[in-house]
């Protein structure tokens, strides 16, 4: 860590300046991955999983979810259930049942909300797994009536998904969980592949 003590006022803007990232090459790389996933499906996702995450595209099994449930402390389970309850209460209060208006005799107009049939959720894993994000995304999707909720999250080096992510997914009613991360996972959910 670089320590700077008592810098001159003229140096402040340079000291706090964020590094500039040239995203031109990054955008081209991302678009290339997305195009490859769109055109080659699972084969492309598997290739990028191995290249970027040193992992294999795979779905999470029921046995893995049961194993994860045993690994999560009771304190965290209780917190996840409480958070799910609170998130659900908030979103249930916003549920819209529609409005019907007879604009003139014999003519009725109405407004109706229809859920997206299938949604994809990307949950970062790694050093700071965002298991609360699972609840905040999957819970309203379930309440809205989405029939299928697909979750992608990168596995660790042993090919395992963080147990708290799996526990949150179970509580929130996620339909399918895939061990996939990065652009390739988002592309798989956006375009669909043979397995995702």
Where are these regions (language model features)?
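Active-site-proximal helix-loop elements at catalytic-domain edges
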Residues: 1-13, 163-173, 177
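Conserved small-residue-rich beta-alpha loop and adjacent elements
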Residues: 101-167
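Short acidic/polar active-site loop segments enriched in Thr and Asp
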Residues: 41, 147, 175
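Conserved NAD(P)+-binding/catalytic subdomain of aldehyde/semialdehyde dehydrogenases
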Residues: 173-196
């Amino acid at each position: 860590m670089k320590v700077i003590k008592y810098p001159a006022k003229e140096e402040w803007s340079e000291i706090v300046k964020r590094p500039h990232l040239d995203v031109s090459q990054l955008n081209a790389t991302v678009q290339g991955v997305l195009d490859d996933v769109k055109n080659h499906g699972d084969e492309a996702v598997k290739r990028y999983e191995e290249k970027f995450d040193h992992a294999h595209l795979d779905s999470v099994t029921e046995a893995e979810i049961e194993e994860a449930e045993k690994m999560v402390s009771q304190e965290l389970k209780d917190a996840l259930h409480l958070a799910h309850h609170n998130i659900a209460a908030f979103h249930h209060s916003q549920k819209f049942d529609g409005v019907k208006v007879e604009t003139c005799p014999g003519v009725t107009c109405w407004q109706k909300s229809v859920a997206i049939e299938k949604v994809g959720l990307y949950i970062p894993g790694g050093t700071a797994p965002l298991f609360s994000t699972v609840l905040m995304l999957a819970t309203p999707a379930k309440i809205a009536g989405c029939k299928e909720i697909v979750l992608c999250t990168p596995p660790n080096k042993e090919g395992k998904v963080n147990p708290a992510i799996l526990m949150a997914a179970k509580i929130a009613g996620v339909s399918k969980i895939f061990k996939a991360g990065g652009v390739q996972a988002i592309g798989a959910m956006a375009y669909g592949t043979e397995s995702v």
